[in-house]
Amino acid sequence: MRALVISGGGSKGAYAGGVAHYLIRHQHTKYDLFLGSSTGSLLLPHLALGNLNKLYNIYTNVNQNSIFSLNPFRVKRKDNREFVSINYVNSLLQFIKRKRTFGESKNLRQLIRKNFSEAEFQKARTNAKDIVVTVSNLTKNKVEYKSIQECTYNDFCEWIWISCNYVPFMSLVEKDGFEYADGGFGCLIPIREAIRRGATEIDAIILESENMEHNKILGKNPFSLMVGLFSFMMDQTERHNIVEGKLAAINKEVTLNLYYTPSKLTENSLIFNKKLMRSWWKQGYAYAERKAQQAKDNELK
């Protein structure tokens, strides 16, 4: 049983889309299981349906307004570079309303429903053995995995949205009496869960470079420093998940194929730049193509 697993990574999901595009469309790889966290959860239903052109259009046409109903960031462009700072007005509004997050991502919830219909939901349930999204239950202090086979359409759309909510910059969601946030806080790349669900071969797309050692530019104010600290903690979670996944794969004799980004794509994956995301999609496609050619060359030797 073959599984496709995609990590979290915000706007870097466009790169994962490019890799998956090559694997599904040009290598004709058939997957039984689809598992993801955060932006990976957004990709899964469309990949299970084979809606690659639709997915490309979604990922290369979103902007900050597509995601945030209240944007906590201000993006300034200077000399073809982007500089991110806090949106003091919006953050102040949140404090006045006694909200616990700097921003809100209700527009993303609408975007998910707009691009994933109930008919597509039913078809996805039939096409794949399972589609699983990762969420973090902050109340219970545990990671949960939500299967499309166990959800209604409304619930599954809600879980996809929750899986992407990078608190405290996006919405903190209360559901079924518990408070939930981004699945990446607990498990950024659910390789081990794919093995637990019976996968015998896994293609895992990791939205980070294989060598995660690079110098970060730390923010000059508390808000941007917080963004950097969260990024650091997520990197450590990802390292742990990958090691854990590799060990589980060895133990269960599972074939594990890892697809990394060739370099650090961005310092802030909550900034959605159409031009960059189009470029990342192409980079992901080219990387998967090169990796396939290298594997073919090694077989011939």
What residue spans do the PLM features occupy?
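Patatin-like phospholipase
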Residues: M1-S37, P45-K301
